[in-house]
Amino acid sequence: MSKLPLGKRLKIRSMVHMAAEPIPNFWPMRTFIHHNPLHGLEHLPFEQAVRQGEKLFHARGFLPREDYQRYHKEGRVDQNSIKRDIADFISKQETLNGLDLASLLSDLMCSVKNKVTRTRALADHDDVFQALHGKQLENAEALDLKALTQRLCAQFAPERPLYEAIDLLFGTQMGTTLDELVIKSCLDFFDEGQSTIQMPGRHQGLFAAWTALAKRNLRLFLRGMHIKQILDQDDTPEGIIAYILDELGIEEAHWDGLITRELTRLHGWAGFIRWRSSSKHYYWAEQYPGDLIDFLAIRLVLGLALIREHSRQKRTPMTVKVLQEYIEGHTAECYLRQAYYGGCILPAFAHDVDDALSHKKPQRINNILPGYLRQQRQFEATRQADALRDLASKAGQTDALMALNAPQIKQLMTLIEAFENEEGMIWLRAMESVYRREIINQIQLYAPHKKEKRPFAQALFCIDVRSEPIRRNLETVGEYQTYGIAGFFGVPVSYIGLGKGSEVNLCPVVITPKNLVLEVPVGATSIETDFYSSADHVLHEMKSSILSPYFTVEAAGLLFGFDMIGKTIAPRRYTQIRNHIEPKAQATRLLVDKLTREQADSIVRSLQRAMIVRAIHQEFGIEREAVTDAMIRELREAAMDNYHEQTEFARRFALSPTAETQFIAGLKKDYKINRSFVSMQMERLARIGFSLDEQVFYVDKALTSIGLTENFSRFVLLAGHGSTSDNNPYESALDCGACGGSHGLVSARVLAHMANKPEVRRRLAKQGIQIPEDTWFVSVMHNTTTDQLSLQDLDLLPNSHLVYLERLRNGLRAATRLSAAERLPALLDHPSPNIDTLSAQKQIERNASDWTQVRPEWGLARNASVVAGGRHLTEGANLSGRTFLQSYDYRLDPKGRHLENILSNPLIIGQWINLEHYFSAVDNEHFGSGSKAYHNVVGRFGVVTGNLSDLRTGLPAQSVLKDGRPYHEPIRLLAIIEAPAAFTLEVAGRLPKVMSLITNGWITVVVVDPETGDRLFYDRGEWYNLNNDPQYTPSVKPLLEEELSA
């Protein structure tokens, strides 16, 4: 029983959940979901959130100045934008006579490598003024112990974990030890089948299972960590949290801040646990529950045990109060300790300080301190003066600087510090200005001309930026018309693949699907047979493994050896040979249609009969051939309370009335053959498939949302996309974000099935969408690693279309080769200038098969914009694979429902992808996941660096950096929307989340108004017409009224 009242326990749970808000969720790697690392701070303006994120995650929110300066030299930065922002900044400052601040700040950005304002613990502006003029510092020997004490106590605020303060003062490294112990505990508990030894008692939950082990952990006890004494104080994680925080002497007012700091030390693990505990249908979470309250309690237990261990061994403080008293009583010692163990000691004093501290010589410490403070103060003042002098020299304003008096130097230093805090945003806006001008000047605002000739084929691609090159190239090789749509084709669905035991949600993570689709083999003798293998997971709560089948160590080793040799020496050829030798994948169909009640009832009965056969064999050892169908049917009726006489089974096998009653009771309880479970089974079966009304709705929605409602071609290709690469834990990060990090082919097959159904087409015709009889929707797999386009389910293709099939394949093949030749140079260190398309395709295929290849494709790197509008806006423009292309025609959307959907789904997903790349590029070590070369897969759900580290949550260096420099250009997503301005703002106003992202600057927006020709850009609370900016090419005249109504 907990000693803590229920109200206090609930308060602590709420406190932990609130403290975890800034920590983003982290999904398992097998379904990698792009996310904004600062998602929990999106309620703040972008610039403010970045600053807070820098403090929370000890990261950098903007590129180093040197990288921006390189972009500036390459013409990727708008100098006019920099000038405007500098002028705006200066207008808010007091003037400094004699200094040209505009020139000074411009040179600071473009000519000075390092920050001008330096960290100063002791030197003030008067000291800097003296150093600037080569004078000795005044009162250099002065020693204000009270001020030092206050500075030290402020440095060790109550929100800072006590062990961090002790580490900094005594070099104990408890924080590192604590992190390692917590990580090991997480690895043991959250493992999903990778480890050969499983942690016992996991079904009890994280805290209970860990407690049971920790109380008996002899190794920790022998080293002096008396964990059992702590755990005996309460048997709930909330009670333990309250006990420890009270024991450490931390006032409740500071609990929020301390909890956030504890969680962000391992924000990868915290993000995974946070996601896992909120995922209701995640198999491993259902089996082995654990949440952040458990995680925090374990961390605090281990932390307190370490603090007590070190206190006994090294006499370090055990509470916040004792720490403060120690600082007040040993100020000189603590000041030198934090400098020495913090790594910022002046080199000339390092040996003396080390000797004095290690031999505990108080008098010597007191003697060292005055000279140390004098030297540190002089060092800080001289370093700051040198930085100011260097800046003035580069700006040609040395005389003006030297003419400033001490108060003016203070004013200048304050001004420069404030400017350098804003500098990152100035660089960012200037880079965005260049890209915005480039893409807007490529947009063609003209009335779409109706083409009389029917296209040979129409193709619907995912809006993914990797679709832009293949779409553009496909349009150049023939009479192809392409569209952009979210990769789940607007149909949210859960999916169970053939032979799989778990559902996969194929839709954006912000949507929860209601319908379930099953994959079944072609040629099954009956629908019951299909379901018997595919629907077992849906109908029974059995522990089915989602892992690959086991095979012997010898066989695994042999296969591994062949793979290692083949995929290293000749990866492309080896893959071709292996694919030829291995059996082809079984042909399958998707169960897309809703079941009738008779079908569902037949399935339930079939499964119940199978369970009764299993029960008879398990309970009595009787084989199936000894039991008649009539016996099974009678037992089923008895279990369902429809039959109350002695059964034929009991008579045949001489069961006593008691044995028969017990067996039937077991059928009800253990084998789930009862009325309530049948009702639940029928409800679950009702999830399978889509009704006719639903199918009509989704096909209509998909077609009208992209403006494809007439002039259908013979082939309408639905291209779902995914990637192929070997030895790549981040493979799902290259798959379809709109499909929850899975391949998009299933979604394409689902919509194709619906759109090809005659009943659906008849209903659509009544709604005004006439799909010709000779139009056939074909699902296509778009492999983004190789740009291959593979036609699917061709056995369903009407005979009348076979004659056109080779022409279609030739066009797709040509587009593939053109795209390969376009993408290859960026993947090579030394690309050939004259590589032909066939050779490019072969090299791209080799990369996909080569498991030594750390970068099989660039994925979504360099993504920068999303365009929602007609293809005429960008047709013929080379957008360099940087743009999400969403087809949209506002004229078919009078109520704005389709635009609502685009803004609240594809735009949000695009923003997550964009900011994942942005932050992984600006600070790959903290927001990204570092180099793949040091990664190890853990638990089958994540990666760590080396053997032990926080879960790496962002993108690896190989996804965003090239030769150590950003390959991804880190700018915010630019949304370009083609629709009347008033209409767009009215629709966006219905979506508070979207408006918040716009007004807080997480995305930038340009509205292209086809009725007025205006191009309106939103920036910091104001709308600006880009037509008034001479840097933008003039837009064409507005569309004529008769054209709009045509």
UniProtKB/Swiss-Prot annotation:
Localization: Cell inner membrane
Principal location listed in the UniProt entry: membrane
Amino-acid positions noted as binding Zn(2+) in the UniProt annotation, renumbered to this chain: C462, D464, H721, C736
Membrane topology summary: Peripheral membrane protein
A Pfam entry, by short name: DabA
GO molecular function, one term: zinc ion binding
Superkingdom of origin: Bacteria
Knockout or disruption consequences: Required for growth in ambient air.
Keyword set includes Zinc: yes
UniProt keyword annotations, A-Z: Cell inner membrane, Cell membrane, Membrane, Metal-binding, Transport, Zinc
Gene Ontology cellular-component annotations: plasma membrane
Cofactor(s) this protein requires: Zn(2+)
Keyword set includes Hydrolase: no
Family: Belongs to the inorganic carbon transporter (TC 9.A.2) DabA family.
Subunit structure: Forms a complex with DabB1.
Function: Part of an energy-coupled inorganic carbon pump.
Full protein name: Probable inorganic carbon transporter subunit DabA1
